[in-house]
Amino acid sequence: MSRKYFGTDGIRGRANGLITPELALKVGQAAGLAFQRGDHRHRVVIGKDTRLSGYMIEYAMVAGFTSVGMDVLLVGPMPTPAVAMLTKSMRADLGVMISASHNLFEDNGIKLFGPQGFKLSDDVEKQIEQLLDEPIDKRLAQSASLGRARRIDGVHDRYIEFAKRTLPRDLSLDGLRVVVDCANGAAYKVVPEALWELGADVVPIGVEPDGFNINKDCGSTSPEALSKKVREMRADIGIALDGDADRVILVDERGHVVDGDQLLAVIAQSWKEDGRLSRPGIVATVMSNLGLERFLKGQGLDLVRTPVGDRYVLEQMLSGGYNLGGEQSGHIILSDYATTGDGFVAALQVLAVVQKSRRPVSEVCHRFDPLPQILKNVRHKGGKPLDDSDVKSAISDGEKRLNGHGRLLIRSSGTEPVIRVMGEGEDRILVEDVVDTIVSALGQAAA
């Protein structure tokens, strides 16, 4: 059974396009019914980021959950990993994050977490999809059994304390000037406060959300503003989160971007030296640079690859017994601490290495020279452009031209109508030409 609503990271789409109040109401009802197990009073934690449509989706979901007898705990704007953590710590049956992650404000989405704070399995999502398409009038709660909703205070402090506990008690960030870009998103209150409490000299940007400016020319997908601010303030490091703070990109003191592959290399080597890796290896996706794989091999560590999506990274980590994994895009999963990607906690692990080494970030965070990698996106209006004969021919020709000295990865995005074309190899000019040829063919097929 193919999935109708769920993509690789929950349900996501244009606000009042795919993501309507009606859909949010039905998702609340369907998920509420799916997670009502046993006779106890059931409850759900709902968080959101700062986009304008969050209010609309939040209230519709409250109506859905309460209509099937589930109590709702509202925590307001909070990072996705904080919602996952709170779901578990507050003994809730379900967690919801209303966010479209790194997308602009026009989009929104619904991410669901089980009682242990993990994203739902494909099977559970399919069960919810079946309920979405079934009439549930006869399964609504009786008047006396309707759910209640309340806003919870103090949740910011809970997450701040959780994040601080991932560092040794004797480690302070004193002496570090840190510019942090919260993308005008969910972390705009908690992360600057946590850094200040840890002793850093904090310069916050992207902390003035207005409902429209989330991820707009800021955050992990647009680190240019952060790079400029780091140089301007002569800071030691810059931290760029995305709209829901489940991914992170760093900037060194020179303003150069440090991607998720380099972060994985830093943490992997540090944890190996400290004996903290549960297995001699880490998990990453097919998008991670071959340079990372070669670096890890030199450290005696394996790299296990998965399809794109942090959920698949986590599944492999759990099944294989790994405690470190992530994506080049900055989703870093540290399963000793969190059940999902946590951009801030990942940044803290790197800051710990910087403090211990007393070396510049540009030295600490450059563990390998990445192979030239070209990634381009082709937006389409539907259909199957990858099945076009000219596209297939361009891909086949490209693979022959790389001839074992590089690789191609062409895939449809699981979160938006985009086909991603990635080429990697030792000859940058050749890789660019191969990718451009495929992108041109896709553009004509998608027109």
From Swiss-Prot:
Pfam families associated with the record: PGM_PMM_I, PGM_PMM_II, PGM_PMM_III, PGM_PMM_IV
GO CC, one annotated term: cytosol
CDD domains: GlmM
One GO process term, biological-process aspect: carbohydrate metabolic process
Active site, per annotation: S101
Annotated positions binding Mg(2+): S101, D242, D244, D246
Co-factor note (free text): Binds 1 Mg(2+) ion per subunit.
PTM (free text): Activated by phosphorylation.
Cofactor: Mg(2+)
EC number, UniProt record: 5.4.2.10
Keywords: Isomerase, Magnesium, Metal-binding, Phosphoprotein
Entries under InterPro entries matching the protein: A-D-PHexomutase_a/b/a-I (IPR005844), A-D-PHexomutase_a/b/a-I/II/III (IPR016055), A-D-PHexomutase_a/b/a-II (IPR005845), A-D-PHexomutase_a/b/a-III (IPR005846), A-D-PHexomutase_C (IPR005843), A-D-PHexomutase_C_sf (IPR036900), Alpha-D-phosphohexomutase_SF (IPR005841), GlmM_bact (IPR006352)
GO molecular function annotations of the record: magnesium ion binding; phosphoglucosamine mutase activity; phosphomannomutase activity
PANTHER family reported in the protein's UniProt record: PHOSPHOGLUCOMUTASE (ALPHA-D-GLUCOSE-1,6-BISPHOSPHATE-DEPENDENT), PHOSPHOHEXOSE MUTASE
Recorded family membership: Belongs to the phosphohexose mutase family.
Protein name in the entry: Phosphoglucosamine mutase
Source species of the chain: Bradyrhizobium diazoefficiens (strain JCM 10833 / BCRC 13528 / IAM 13628 / NBRC 14792 / USDA 110)
